[in-house]
Amino acid sequence: MDNLQSIKAQFIAQINAYQPEKDRDIVVFQCNTETTFSLLAWLKAQQYYPQFYLHGRDGATKWASIGQVRQFSDVSAAAHFIQEQQLALLGGLQFYGDALFVLPRLLLQQRQDGMTITLFIDGKQFEQDKLVALACLSTFEKQTALQTVKQEISLISQKADQAEWCRWVEQGLQKIKQGELSKIVLANERCFKTAAPLAATDLLAESEKYNLGCYHFMLAESEQRAFIGSSPELLYRRHGLQLKTEALAGTAFMGEDEQQNQQQSDWLLHDKKNEYENQLVVDGICQNLQPFVQQITIEKVELKKLRKVQHLRRRISAQLKAGCGDKDILLAMHPTAAVAGLPQLEAKQALRKLENFDRTWYAGTLGVMGPAYADFCVTIRSAFIEQAENDSQLCVFAGAGIVEGSIPLLEWREIERKAMGLVSLLQQNQL
């Protein structure tokens, strides 16, 4: 594209004209343009990693990045860097707390009225690092067309079949009966082999079309492996000291029949078990936030309707105390009772014993963290895509909240339904 070629030339000229300054930690070059284009098609053409993509749930903002100038595996160090440099980082926490935050090489932030493109170079070793930056710009103007994802897929493995997963549920219910837990969220992983190579960018673009009202995210740490998903769930959003979060828990089906969907909605809004499950998440969030906020407002229950399922949701807003920031909120809130259980620590310990796999990024959190603004989603409805020579492997995750009164077989059907949000995109006549 001519405009991207022009922006690339501007960046190269700015880099070559820059005179390094002593004690300048990060050098920032920035360009604004009214041009908009598919960030996923752009990412597909880029060769530098890690790659990050986040499409905000409100639909107004998208972020895409390639490469990295700084990387942090500690939330405190990441938060300190943000305050010191007044720059935003991308990344998040895996389910069990391992952190990854990066200052990318190139960051594209797309809004409805245009785009801001930012290039970062390490000021402490500018001459060496500018060569990496220039190499990263070599394909800046390129895009690769997104392809259809419809193809044959076959199930090759699952961490638990129906019988074993239902046994996990029975064990979880036993812990609830004994008073060790009030809720536990059990998940499963199912792996499919595709008939032809499947690009993560292609599948995520397809998901954006059909899985509306969601965050859409991708974290590709290499060309061979990417984590993607379309999550309905906000962990939290912060503007200054204003915090917004939500309790998303309690599930019913959604399908093609509007009358049946309405019946499911009415049932969900009046079902005591689902109401209780959602209230546990509200209680868990409020309890974890309490040391860091001045006041909490909880709104009335509403429905969050998706393509395959619908959920109970209660929006929660709070005013942060002065001096409290993202480090405090992230570590206090994650993982919420919506994806782990309650009490938080005991639920995580139980999951390590019951589930026979490491969740890594599933039910973690990914987002943007800056000085005045943060936006994090919960990485559910997600999958890993691994590339082989002639095909790909798609490993899909789904979970269900188990509380007193949960019926194992119904919970199994729920996770099957949730997994279809991504799997059905590949299958003919399954949308």
From Swiss-Prot:
<feature type="binding site">
    <location>
        <position position="277"/>
    </location>
    <ligand>
        <name>Mg(2+)</name>
    </ligand>
</feature>
<dbReference type="InterPro" id="IPR034681">
    <property type="entry name" value="MenF"/>
</dbReference>
<dbReference type="GO" id="GO:0008909">
    <property type="term" value="F:isochorismate synthase activity"/>
</dbReference>
<feature type="binding site">
    <location>
        <position position="414"/>
    </location>
    <ligand>
        <name>Mg(2+)</name>
    </ligand>
</feature>
<keyword id="KW-0460">Magnesium</keyword>
<comment type="pathway">
    <text>Quinol/quinone metabolism; menaquinone biosynthesis.</text>
</comment>
<protein>
    <recommendedName>
        <fullName>Isochorismate synthase MenF</fullName>
        <ecNumber>5.4.4.2</ecNumber>
    </recommendedName>
</protein>
<dbReference type="InterPro" id="IPR005801">
    <property type="entry name" value="ADC_synthase"/>
</dbReference>
<keyword id="KW-0413">Isomerase</keyword>
<dbReference type="InterPro" id="IPR044250">
    <property type="entry name" value="MenF-like"/>
</dbReference>
<keyword id="KW-0479">Metal-binding</keyword>
<comment type="function">
    <text>Catalyzes the conversion of chorismate to isochorismate.</text>
</comment>
<comment type="pathway">
    <text>Quinol/quinone metabolism; 1,4-dihydroxy-2-naphthoate biosynthesis; 1,4-dihydroxy-2-naphthoate from chorismate: step 1/7.</text>
</comment>
<feature type="active site" description="Proton donor">
    <location>
        <position position="233"/>
    </location>
</feature>
<comment type="similarity">
    <text>Belongs to the isochorismate synthase family.</text>
</comment>
<dbReference type="InterPro" id="IPR015890">
    <property type="entry name" value="Chorismate_C"/>
</dbReference>
<keyword id="KW-0474">Menaquinone biosynthesis</keyword>
<feature type="active site" description="Proton acceptor">
    <location>
        <position position="183"/>
    </location>
</feature>
<dbReference type="InterPro" id="IPR004561">
    <property type="entry name" value="IsoChor_synthase"/>
</dbReference>
<dbReference type="Pfam" id="PF00425">
    <property type="entry name" value="Chorismate_bind"/>
</dbReference>
<dbReference type="GO" id="GO:0009234">
    <property type="term" value="P:menaquinone biosynthetic process"/>
</dbReference>
<dbReference type="GO" id="GO:0000287">
    <property type="term" value="F:magnesium ion binding"/>
</dbReference>
